[in-house]
Amino acid sequence: MPAVSFAPYRRALRSKPLRTALVLGTLVRMPVFASTVLLTIHVVSSLDRSYTAAGVLAAAATVAIAVSGPWRGRLLDRYGLRRVVLPSILVALVCWSIAPFVDYLLLLGLAVLAGLFVIPTFSITRQAVIAAVGEEERRTAISLDAVAVELSFIVAPAVAVWAATVWDTSWVLFTIQMLGVGAGILMYVVDPPLRGEGEAVVGTARASSRTWFRLPFLAVCLAATATTVVLAGSDIAIIAVMRDIAAEGQIGLVLAVWGLGSLIGGLLYGALHRPISAFWLLAGLAAATFPMALASSTVQLAASGFVAGLLCAPTITATIDQASRIVPAQVRGEAMGWHGSFMTTGGAVGAPLAGLAIDRGGPGAGFVVVAAVGVVVAALGLTAVSVRRATASAT
């Protein structure tokens, strides 16, 4: 096990651009995480539609966001932050000023349109975080960003659910989306740098996709997909287990403990002196997810979830770190867009895959199926790396 030292965090956090990027990223992501759960509540309660209808809306918006990732990232590389973010702000302002107050079909259309022009939050934040520090602190900085994501994921949905129980969901949805618009305006004003010292500036000649959009990059992106398959599927399976043992009121507690494990794991990974391959971390995450299928009480599920959670943020961090080192700086926006789209796709696949397994084999089957996906992808990735190294040695 590599040695752990928190000195890299002290060095990284001396960077004002890094601190700025982390704060901006958190402010912009909070409304995104809050809106995901709030849209479901709004469709089911205020619009009086089914959970299926809510799922269709979520899936449509997810596909739109996944499609937008690479081309919005490419525009970031070509034109810079402000020229990409401004249209997103205007589209979001128009769409979400109307969407909370209309019927389901119009809401669906506006959500898809807003998704296609969504602020490329993850691509911008990750580029700004990478640009803010040197090569030696990159993994630590990305780990800090992963911790910020975990905090947003834990806090934002909880606040949104609470607000939806107190006020009308239409106005809560409107308020949260306008906060997102405000965060986008702040990002536009601050305009954090997306290139580090000595790297190609935005708008310079692009590297051909044939030089980087190849097997090594795609393999890392596939690992990112498998990671979110495991996480999204586990999310559904946790809910299923808690319902099965009649402990629905403690679902939030189990999810919070799971998220706490991820937060701690992310901090520890950033403190390591040497990186660990994303494929090994994915294998560990999948292996740690299997025991969650055996849990038959809240304590057992929370404990096993905490252990699995320790590898959640590190696995995602490792895929981002490896992907960013594979591609040239002048196409990093597009690369991070592709990485984000692969992760979004994994989330969209993991939930229904686990749901299908749960319907056929019970709550524990959800964990088993998504963990198996993680094991298979990790094994394929490790095999590909071994073959590549053997081939390189032979030549």
Predicted regions and their residues:
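Conserved MFS/SLC helix-loop-helix module at the cytosolic interface between two early adjacent transmembrane helices
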Residues: A66-F101
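Helix-loop boundary and gating motifs at the non-cytosolic
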Residues: S5-T62, T211-V254
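Intracellular juxtamembrane helix-capping segments at the cytosolic ends
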Residues: P120-V133, I238, P314-V327
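Structural signature of the two symmetry-related core transmembrane helices
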Residues: R83-S97, F174-Q177, S277-P291
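Helix-to-loop junctions at the C-terminal end of transmembrane segments
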Residues: V67-G80, A164, L263-S277, I358
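Cytoplasmic helix-loop-helix junction between adjacent transmembrane helices
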Residues: V112-L151
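C-terminal transmembrane helical hairpin of 12-TM major facilitator-type secondary transporters
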Residues: A278-T317
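A late C-terminal transmembrane helix in Major Facilitator Superfamily
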Residues: V331-P363
